[in-house]
Amino acid sequence: MNKIQVLDCTLRDGGYCNDCRFGFENEKKIVHGLVEANVDIIECGFLMNTVEYDQDVTRFTSLDEVAKIIPKDKEGKTFVMLTDYGKYHPENLPEYNGVSVDGLRVAFHKKDRVAALEECKKIKNKGYKVFVQAMVSLSYTDEEFLDLIHRVNELEPYVFYIVDSFGMMKRKDLTRLFYLVEHNLNEKIKIGFHSHNNMQLAYSNAQSLVDLHSDRELIIDSSVYGMGRGAGNLNTELFVQYLNDNADGNYDIKPLLSIIDEILNEFYQRNYWGYSLPNYLSAAHNAHPNYAGYLDDKKTLTVENMNEIFDMMDEDKKVSYDKDYIEQLYLRYMATGKSQEEHKTDLQKKIKGKTILLIAPGKSSIEERKKIASFINEDVVTISVNYNYPLVNTDYIFLSNLRRFRELNASNREKCIVTSNIPADNVYIQTKYRELLCDIEAVKDNAGLMAIKYFTQMGAKKIYLAGFDGYSHDEKENYGESTMAFVTRTAVLDAMNVGMTEMLKKYSSIVELKFLTEQHYVKI
């Protein structure tokens, strides 16, 4: 049986879920719990030159800062940090003295591998254990990976890692890379494995490494509760239990469960991580998981839409996340549809100079149904937004969301005003999607704001808003119909509320805007 060590990366990889803001006391509690659990190697966070130090955040600029959360008695545990190539200058490292971290993990993309190994050499020369992290290992050809291994042999670091950055590595892929490394890597160098869980394979892949007949020393990364970017990581608590049961492990599970219960659960509620369909799609397309997160946060796309956007991506853009790139790709995709405006003149005649009531699907549209019913008269034009309001037969339905359009009964299509991103026949009007966008990213194509802009252009005199409640962190509070509720990150919801408020204020300077029903999280 090969010797296995566990490296817990909760304080570093988990930081993608909370912007590394664990809180100073929680940082110390997590470290203490990991030591109690007998975890072999503890990663404390990022080391970088590009930030300012904040003790509540696990992004550090010096080893003195991270030493504040490392116990004086390390109890035989190894403490490390990770630096992304180019974000820290090894010249700033003091000589190793055992007080702070014992090693540094250097993560790099294939294009930077030669220069990154030079940085690793400088770090090793200062006495630290060096962990070589070849990100997106599957992006290498066998020849390229062998060349990297030969260069690593010359360096002779502490460990060389196989890295499944996008959670797409299947057992046959892992086995192939492992034997390639095992047969060619200097025997003095340990073999590491870092995985993500986009395809729910992190646990089974780790087990397969445990079960391999090899004399090599292994280091396998995990995080408590699987806390990590996108689909998360291998769960520390599950993996060490497996080692206890199958590989003579000597880990205490209880401190790990306490970390989950007392600290991580709260972060999970605010910004969940774990397996999801978008994260599966990113892995299937060998793309950075943040792309999936961006598209999922839109809540406007079907699985087919996301697949088509991934298919549009340039191969060289998939490896590193580029927010501007995916935003432009999303907008280009959404703007590809046709427009059909033969009834536009008729609509303008019906809207110009009139009072408009826009009914969005917020909970107040149901709770204050009597107020809505009593407000409506023959001089008010009623439009429901992104759904068919069940309590009033509205004059029109405005839709910009393909998901919502598909849920609509076909008999209602003749009164639908849809944006051009929705492929639709037999609708009243199909208007240009791109012309209704606003300037704030979080709500750039929010249906309610698009409707306000559209009917303002049509000449509405006053626009009253019903069901424009904004977004609660409790998804059950957001919609009058429970089937419309969706779960998303609280940071996204907060940004949407801020963006809606800002745009409502802007539009109120162009047209008279008033709330008819109680709003909770937005205002004019």
Residue ranges and their predicted role:
Residues S339-I524:
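Metal-ion/cofactor- or nucleotide/acyl-coenzyme-handling active-site neighborhoods
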Residues M1-E341:
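Catalytic cores and adjacent flexible loops of soluble metabolic enzymes
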